[in-house]
């Protein structure tokens, strides 16, 4: 159905008609000029992410439901990275004419899946038209007690550096998708050049080769915010001294922590958690797997520091790896290779010159 047939308000009503409030802090959600929230005993955390088609996602290989899920999860991840609990979400969309009502419903179904997983209320947003493509802007609102909030600037000399999950898989998943996309388009161009109509018809049923790489696809297409790690830390009585989520790459995030905390760091290549599929894919593509793990981005794992006294507790946690320690600023930022050589840790995350 064409969105113009039901209009903006009709679309909003259709998307939000079944929303049920999950949080006491949500006093009034969708349906008025503003949502009404109440946080009498907590600090309020607010984060926003903007995703643009052609810059942050490619609809050639991500479907709208997965896109909605990922768009929500990257915002929830920011709240977890502050040691908070996400409570509400607003969703704003700019849509070109090629998107139907059903397309938007599919996108929203992914957003709702993410929100249902972490008991988050969708309380508002906006829609508008776009001349080109799709733009998604999501704002997440969370809460935390003042004494529980973890900033980037709290790391101290001798603190341990930890990371959840594994690194580089999402980036290698992207490389896999790009490879298969290029294979498809090169075959299409070849068929067109030869005027081979039969080949073009067969390419309509093109099957990319993802065998043995399913985990990499999942990490790229279905990002997960690590709220489970926050729960484990709380249950273990561990309060990180500094924390970030790994969106631009481990190197970039760790250097942010060091800069804002006024410290140095020392991490060890052999301690970096890397999945087997990531290593195999890096070898296939003649890429350095350590570089992928350090700079790939979109892992949405948590990198955090804890006092050295929490070492025994950290060792007991599943899916958390100790990768190094914080040093005095004068010692710089060091990566120790598997053979003991020392290199300056550098960030290759997102920037405006990229």
Name the predicted role of every residue range:
Residues 1-63, 82, 91:
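Extreme N-terminal cap/leader segments of soluble proteins
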Residues 2-20, 98-121, 131-136, 141, ...:
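Glycine-/charge-enriched secondary-structure boundary and capping motifs
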Residues 28, 60-74, 98-109, 147:
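Glycine-rich anion/phosphate-binding loops
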Residues 36, 75, 83, 122, ...:
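Residue-level signal for inorganic ion chemistry
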Residues 38-41, 87-180, 325:
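Glycine-rich anion-binding loops of enzyme active sites
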Residues 45, 135, 151-231:
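Short, acidic (Asp/Glu-rich) active-site segment that either coordinates a divalent metal cofactor
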Residues 62-65, 216-222, 241-242, 290-292:
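Short pre-catalytic strand/loop immediately N-terminal to key active-site residues, enriched for Gly-Thr
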Residues 64-88, 109-117, 232, 251-257:
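Small-aliphatic-rich amphipathic alpha-helix that forms the alpha element of a beta-alpha
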């Amino acid at each position: 159905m064409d969105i113009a047939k039901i209009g903006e308000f009709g679309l909003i009503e259709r998307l939000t008609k079944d929303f049920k409030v999950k949080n006491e802090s949500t006093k009034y959600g969708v349906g008025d000029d503003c949502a009404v929230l109440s946080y009498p005993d907590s600090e309020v955390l607010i984060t926003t992410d903007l995703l643009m088609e052609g810059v942050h996602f490619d609809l050639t290989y991500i479907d709208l439901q997965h896109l909605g899920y990922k768009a929500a999860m990257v915002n929830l991840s920011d709240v977890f990275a502050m040691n908070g609990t996400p409570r509400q979400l607003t969703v704003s969309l700019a849509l070109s004419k090629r998107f139907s009502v059903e397309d938007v419903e599919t996108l929203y179904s992914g957003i709702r899946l993410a929100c249902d997983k972490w008991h988050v209320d969708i309380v508002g947003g906006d829609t508008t038209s776009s001349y080109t493509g799709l733009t998604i802007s999501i704002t997440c609102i969370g809460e935390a007690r003042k004494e529980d909030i973890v900033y980037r600037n709290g790391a101290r000399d001798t603190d341990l550096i930890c990371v959840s999950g594994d690194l580089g898989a999402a980036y290698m998943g992207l490389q896999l998708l790009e490879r298969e996309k290029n294979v498809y388009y090169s075959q299409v161009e070849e068929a067109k050049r030869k005027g081979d109509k039969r080949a073009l018809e067969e390419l309509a049923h093109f099957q990319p080769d993802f065998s043995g790489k399913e985990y990499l696809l999942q990490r790229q297409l279905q990002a997960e915010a690590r709220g489970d790690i926050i729960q484990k830390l709380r249950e273990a009585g561990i309060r990180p001294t500094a924390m970030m989520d790994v969106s631009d790459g481990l190197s970039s995030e760790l250097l942010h922590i060091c800069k804002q905390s006024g410290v140095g760091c020392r991490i060890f290549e052999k301690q970096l958690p890397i999945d087997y599929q990531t290593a195999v894919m890096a070898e296939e593509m003649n890429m350095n797997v350590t570089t992928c793990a350090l700079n790939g981005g979109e892992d949405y794992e948590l990198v955090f520091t804890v006092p050295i006294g929490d070492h025994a507790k950290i060792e007991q946690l599943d899916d958390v790896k100790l990768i190094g320690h914080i040093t005095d600023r004068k010692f710089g930022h060091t990566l120790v290779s598997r053979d003991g050589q020392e290199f300056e840790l550098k960030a290759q995350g997102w920037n405006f010159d990229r």
